[in-house]
C-alpha cells in the first residue's frame, strides 16, 4: 500500500493523451487502457512536475474543495490502481 511519501512516475511504455478535459493512458506493452476524469487528470499533470504524492496532495488541496483525509485516500487508491495496472511506477 502506498503512503503519501511515495514518489511516482509514468513509465516509458505508457503514452498519455488529452481528450477534452479527460486524460487517456495506454500501456503499449500490456495494452492496458485507462481514462481519468478532470480531477484524475490534474493528479497526473502534477505527478509529472511534483513527483511526490505529499506535494501533489498539498497543491490539490489549494485547488479543490475537499478534506485532506478524503483527497489523500482518493489519490492513494487511484495511484495504487494505476501501479497495479502498470500505468505508474516508483520513481
Positions of PLM-derived features:
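Long, charge-rich, low-complexity alpha-helical segments
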Residues: 32-91
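Acidic, low-complexity/disordered tracts enriched in E/D and polar residues
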Residues: 1-41, 45, 91
Amino acid at each position: 500500500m502506498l503512503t503519501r511519501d511515495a514518489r511516482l512516475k509514468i513509465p516509458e511504455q505508457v503514452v498519455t493523451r488529452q481528450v477534452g478535459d479527460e486524460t487517456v493512458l495506454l500501456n503499449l506493452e500490456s495494452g492496458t487502457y485507462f481514462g481519468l476524469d478532470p480531477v484524475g487528470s490534474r493528479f497526473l499533470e502534477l505527478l509529472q512536475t511534483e513527483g511526490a504524492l505529499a506535494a501533489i496532495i498539498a497543491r490539490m488541496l489549494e485547488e479543490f474543495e475537499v478534506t485532506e483525509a478524503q483527497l489523500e485516500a482518493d489519490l492513494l487508491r487511484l495511484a495504487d490502481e494505476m501501479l497495479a495496472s502498470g500505468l505508474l511506477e516508483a520513481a
